[in-house]
């Protein structure tokens, strides 16, 4: 029997973010500043996936994401799974939950919002409505679909 070949090399210890929708890997790298840790980061783009057709994957050597950071990922890749690796084995597999609130990640699309002209940090309340992720601005109280809100 032939041993399966990995598309992206295994890591001994760290974090694997799997099942990222194809094309979202770079956004996650940038938004979560995963390259700033100074650790080896391996990224696979448009890899074959049985459930998604194609996917991205990110492996970060020597870094473990906390629950808060992992759940922030749900805003970019709701179906992603965060695996904690130790001695080349998955020791924890986390399915993501949307956070109740998110700050300093997105910009409010409302140009009249106080978050644009005042020295305040953007802040949104996160809700799921009819299967869609919605963000309500803390300052202007307008609600937007996740896709219509730009990254900060």
From Swiss-Prot:
InterPro entries: Asp_carbamoyltransf_reg_N, Asp_carbamoylTrfase_reg, Asp_carbamoyltrfase_reg_C, Asp_carbatrfase_reg_C_sf, Asp_carbatrfase_reg_N_sf. Gene3D superfamilies: Aspartate carbamoyltransferase regulatory subunit, C-terminal domain, Aspartate carbamoyltransferase regulatory subunit, N-terminal domain. GO terms for cellular component: aspartate carbamoyltransferase complex. Its cofactor is Zn(2+). One of its GO terms (biological process) is 'de novo' pyrimidine nucleobase biosynthetic process. Keywords: Metal-binding, Pyrimidine biosynthesis, Zinc. The keyword Glycoprotein does not apply. The keyword Zinc applies. One of its GO terms (molecular function) is metal ion binding. SUPFAM superfamilies: Aspartate carbamoyltransferase, Regulatory-chain, C-terminal domain, Aspartate carbamoyltransferase, Regulatory-chain, N-terminal domain. Zn(2+) binds at residues 108, 113, 137, 140. Binds 1 zinc ion per subunit. Pfam families: PyrI, PyrI_C. Involved in allosteric regulation of aspartate carbamoyltransferase. Contains catalytic and regulatory chains. Belongs to the PyrI family. This is Aspartate carbamoyltransferase regulatory chain. It comes from Neisseria meningitidis serogroup A / serotype 4A (strain DSM 15465 / Z2491).
């Amino acid at each position: 029997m032939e041993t399966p070949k990995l598309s992206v090399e295994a890591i001994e210890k760290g974090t694997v973010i799997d099942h990222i929708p194809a094309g979202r890997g770079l956004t996650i790298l940038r938004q979560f500043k995963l390259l700033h840790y100074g650790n080896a980061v391996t990224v696979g783009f448009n890899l074959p996936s049985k459930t998604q057709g194609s996917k991205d994957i990110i492996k970060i050597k020597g870094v473990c994401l906390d629950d808060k950071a992992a759940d922030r990922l749900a805003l970019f890749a709701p179906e992603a799974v965060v695996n904690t690796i130790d001695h080349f084995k998955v020791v924890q597999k986390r399915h993501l939950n949307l956070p109740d609130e998110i700050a300093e990640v997105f910009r409010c699309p409302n140009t009249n919002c106080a978050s644009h002209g005042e020295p305040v940090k953007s802040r949104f309340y996160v809700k799921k409505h009819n299967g869609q992720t919605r963000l309500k601005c803390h300052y202007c109280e307008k609600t937007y679909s996740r896709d219509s809100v730009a990254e900060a």
